[in-house]
Structure formats: C-alpha cells, structure tokens
C-alpha cells in the first residue's frame, strides 16, 4: 500500500539532552502506524518556533494543525479514527499534532489550529500526553485498517 499522508507529533518546550522515558514507546507506536501514514516527531523550544515551522509546511494541501488543549474537543477513539480517515480521504498530505508549552497555547496559536483536541478535563504531563497521542494515532490506524488491536477495547 502506498502511503501519502505524513503525521508529525510535535511538542513545545524541548530541552537539549533531556531524558524522556516515554520516547521508545512513542517511537514504537508511530512506527507501527506506518500502514496509514509516515510518522515522525519534532521538538521545538518555543511556541514561536513551532508556529514558524507551521508556516513553512507546504504541499499540495495545507498542513492541518491539531493542538492538544484542555479546552478542545473530546472524541472517542472511533470518532478520532473517522476524523483521521476523512482527512486521509480528502487528500490531506500532512497532519501535525502538537503538545503545547507548559503555560498553554496562546490565543494566536489556538486561532491557527484546524482542531483543538482534548483528552479530558484532567491535567496530563506533557510527556504522557505525547505517549497518549501516539497510541491514539496507532489505534486510529488499526481501526482504519481493520486490525484487531482495537477490538478488545
């Protein structure tokens, strides 16, 4: 199967040399998602550098920015898979999921987002939010391809 969509899992507030115990699991989930999309991670020192990166994303279609935000829309895994599948079917080339800075996203960043997505009302550590997002991307890919991973939910 040819894969034409790219997914980037970005996070803000990266520190050079910082240790992230979740990184191997994040990479594992993203590698396993390759049936639907090419996946990668990106780290940014600030929201400003992330927004500059967003401005430079070009292709046949504009990049879709999904910001994880406590005020965002909550979805079931099935609804998220349907949303991701619809973007794929529309021909979207690049979807960027981003975990924001510790102080939260600015109003300007929220306005640039195509979707604000929330895991719920609880506050979640940024590294854990990245892991949860990577797992949900993988789960969505398995739902879209009929893989049994999600069937035991």
Q: Model regions: which residues?
A:
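N-terminal beta1-alpha1 ligand-phosphate binding loop
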Residues: 2-30
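Short, low-complexity, intrinsically disordered N-terminal peptides in bacterial proteins
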Residues: 1-6, 56-61, 152-153
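Short, conserved catalytic or adaptor-binding loops enriched in Gly and charged residues
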Residues: 30-34, 109
